[in-house]
């Protein structure tokens, strides 16, 4: 494809209910870089192929996946975009609460294991919970001594939950990818933000040669069936700058949200060696050694 088709305003996108895809010039420039290499890799394979577009918060997974699918369809390669965000075990609100519960339960167990539970600490911790400040360092040296133990234990527990089968039904996603490879009809889950907003749509595979899975966890070790993982990389500093710019008042995330993002970033880094394409935040394809150097300096 010598010239890339213009992107219409009503471009089809993923299947997450209520998802908003806002494509800008930056997304298009990155897709232009990815697309030729993607076509090369697809040419090396045979049969139906699954492409995963993964990365952390704010890297443009949904937008870039939509552009790649649009161009593939224009070239006659029938392509469908599927969002992995439909497959957590809980709706977003309940999953946020479960993340917090796991963190706090883990933190409490850490205090118990160290023999640090007292009525005074229990009362202070309850106050911090009510203020959503238990993931923040304390300005009091005495308080920080036990709060640091709580945070470390909570973070350890949260790491064991985020992006694991406890949080996400990876088996269902892997099953969908297996059905796609076989050419069977797909039953795709739809999850909204309320308990009643849950259903399945049937999708025929006839005429579909590529499936693009756009998802933070698209390169996870728990997932099977991905042929071409694409990592849209972002360093921790770049992620922080993006989220700060997105907040109208320029504030940063809460300490707990920042912790969640840091843990997800570490997991993405641990899985990055499997990516067939790694794209930097600046829109450059990175080799594995270049990626390692970039993240080491981050």
What label would you give each PLM region?
Residues 102-105, 156-162, 223-268, 294-297:
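A glycine- and Lys/Arg-enriched "phosphate-lid" helix/loop adjacent to the NTP-binding pocket
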Residues 58:
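Walker A (P-loop) phosphate-binding loop of P-loop NTPases
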Residues 70-80:
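Post-Walker A helix-loop "phosphate-sensing" segment adjacent to the P-loop in P-loop NTPases
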Residues 61:
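Conserved lysine of the Walker
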Residues 64, 68:
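Hydrophobic positions on the alpha1 helix immediately C-terminal to the Walker A/P-loop
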Residues 142, 146, 198-246:
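ATP-dependent NMP and nucleoside kinases share a basic, alpha-helical "lid"
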Residues 79-80, 87-195:
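Conserved nucleotide-sensing/catalytic segment adjacent to the nucleotide-binding pocket
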Residues 2-44, 228-231, 241-249, 265-298:
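NTP-dependent small-molecule kinase module
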